[in-house]
Every structure is written in structure tokens, then in C-alpha cells.
Amino acid sequence: MSWQAYVDDHLMCDIEGHEDHRLTAAAIVGHDGSVWAQSATFPQFKPEEMNGIMTDFNEPGHLAPTGLHLGGTKYMVIQGEAGAVIRGKKGSGGITIKKTGQALVFGIYKEPVTPGQCNMVVERLGDYLLEQGL
């Protein structure tokens, strides 16, 4: 399966059978910042934004004072799983990032998708990739 198929079929899919419940954007990005696959709506990000995200995985709490920035959008960092998951909130939407051995799985959402639904979709694919040694 291509990386694009993982994004299209496992991240940008209907959530829990609701056609109107989909992530607004998603991507799989290598630890080096190279995009493996992304939705058409995934924001252009700056290298320093990706560096900040990677630093937070290695040094949990790094982004808390400044917020998580992606594509120029600032998210307030909320409780995640140290070294494994970063979660951010902005208004009625947010972001979930799951770290695997070689990649970061991104999901961005807004209402009617809930934070829990975004977490489920992103972390399910991330856990699968971890099981595959990726």
C-alpha cells in the first residue's frame, strides 16, 4: 500500500460511519521533515516548525510555553503522551501527532469531529505502523 493510500483511506476517512465526520487535513511526515504523503488540505509547514515538534517528542514540555506551530497556525499544547503523542487545541478544532519509529502521523480536525475521534484515527494508524516496525 502506498503512503498516500494510508492518508486517504485511514486518516481522511469517514469517522465512525459519519460522512460529515472527517479530519480536515492529515499527513505522514518523516522524522527529517520529508513529507511521505499528505491530504490536499495539509498546510505548508516551515522546517523550524517540524524541528520544534521533534524536539517536543524528545524533550516533553518543550512546546508548552510557546505553543505548537504548523503552517503558521498556533495550537495550545494540551495533555498528550510524553514521547509518543502531542495534542494541540485551537478554538473548536485541534491537532493530534503520533510518533512512530520513522514517521509522524498528523491529523487536524474541526467540529463536528471531536478531539477523541481525531486521537482515535491518528493513534490507530500510528500504532499499526509501530507494529510494522515503521
Swiss-Prot record:
**A GO cellular component entry from the record:** cell cortex
The modified positions for Phosphothreonine read 114
Entry comment on modification after translation: Phosphorylated by MAP kinases.
Entry keyword set: Actin-binding, Allergen, Cytoplasm, Cytoskeleton, Disulfide bond, Phosphoprotein
Organism, per UniProt?
A: Olea europaea
From the record, give the transmembrane residue ranges. none
- Taken from the record, one Pfam family name reads Profilin
* Quaternary organization: Occurs in many kinds of cells as a complex with monomeric actin in a 1:1 ratio.
Name of the molecule in the record: Profilin-4
Q: Which GO terms describe its molecular function?
A: actin monomer binding
Q: Which family does it belong to?
A: Belongs to the profilin family.
Matching entries from Gene3D superfamilies are given as: Dynein light chain 2a, cytoplasmic
The disulfide bonds in this chain are 13-118
